[in-house]
Amino acid sequence: DVQMIQSPSSLSASLGDIVTMTCQASQGTSINLNWFQQKPGKAPKLLIYGASILEDGVPSRFSGSRYGTDFTLTISSLEDEDMATYFCLQHSYLPYTFGGGTKLEIKR
């Protein structure tokens, strides 16, 4: 199975900060990767698909990039509403696998 190693598991940042999190695939090429945002009690929301394509309606402060088997989600100019857990999903190789998640908190 392809393992998706996500880091950090949690982070705290201030409003207006630039935040990054990464997922690294343990193996494979041509990995198709999505990023999701999940808030407590809510269904996951697709942010980015194909590693870097922004889903319709998602603010442009979210962006995704890829270098080989390393994938990065960046949030620029952090806002209060961005407090959530973020996770990646690879859906190129069965079984599809998720990263462990990154819990993002806002420093007060």
Swiss-Prot record:
Alphabetical UniProt keywords: Adaptive immunity, Disulfide bond, Immunity, Immunoglobulin
Region (Framework-2): 35-49
Region (Framework-4): 98-108
Biological process per Gene Ontology, one example term: adaptive immune response
SMART domains: IG (SM00409), IGv (SM00406)
Region ranges (Complementarity-determining-2): 50-56
Region Complementarity-determining-1, annotated ranges: 24-34
Alphabetical list of InterPro entries matching this protein: Ig-like_dom, Ig-like_dom_sf, Ig-like_fold, Ig_sub, Ig_V-set, IgV_Light_Chain
Any one GO cellular component localisation term in the record: immunoglobulin complex
Top-level taxon in the UniProt lineage: Eukaryota
Disulfide bonds: 23-88
Region of interest (Complementarity-determining-3), residue spans: 89-97
Segments for region (Framework-1): 1-23
Chain spans, region Framework-3: 57-88
Pfam families: V-set
Note: This chain was isolated from myeloma proteins that bind beta(2-1)-fructofuranosyl moieties (inulin).
Name under which the protein is recorded: Immunoglobulin kappa variable 11-125
Organism: Mus musculus
Gene: Igkv11-125
